[in-house]
Amino acid sequence: MEPTADHDDNIAQSPSTRANAAADDGGPLHPWMPVTFASRSPGSRVFPSAVVHGDSLYIFGGHDGGVYRNDLLVFNLETRVWLLDLELTGGGPSPRDAHAAVVHDEWMYVFGGYDSKRYLNDFHRFHFDDLAWSSVPVGGGAPSPRGGHTAVVHAGEMLVFGGCDGWNYFNDLYARAAPPTQAARTAAILFSPTLSHSLSQVQVQL
């Protein structure tokens, strides 16, 4: 069983947290504001991934009340226009949600997720300029199948943390170079096992 959520097709933005986000100066937070779309929106879905590359937001997968998806939606942050019918090559990942995606150079990397029947640990990448998907060999030492994990890129490595496989909750941390090489599990135990969390990098810390 994966977590449930209400569906909403809204996007909200905040200009920043504070003038100096690295220092808690005690100042007021900037308010969130709904984003107005200048075109037809894609509709509601839960547990997709979202990354930013250039001036666009790329949203992959998710589900909308039982239908698991593997489409790629692009929202131009300058024009506020959705691109919903991109002609992609390479096939791409199978429909899923609760996966993780990161950006490194001209690629988006997608790992794992849940497809309504099983948890996954496959690995795919998407080239932004060529609009092409390709699968990446998982290799030895890869994380076990999971969903609800998080990922970031630091110093040329994709770091994957946590998640669950329906029975077990994880607090392991894996690193893999991008471009991909064999994954390696780190020795650090960071937090209690967790899923559906968030992860970000601030300088050299997660």
Would you name each region that the model predicts?
Residues 1-206:
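Kelch-like beta-propeller repeat domains
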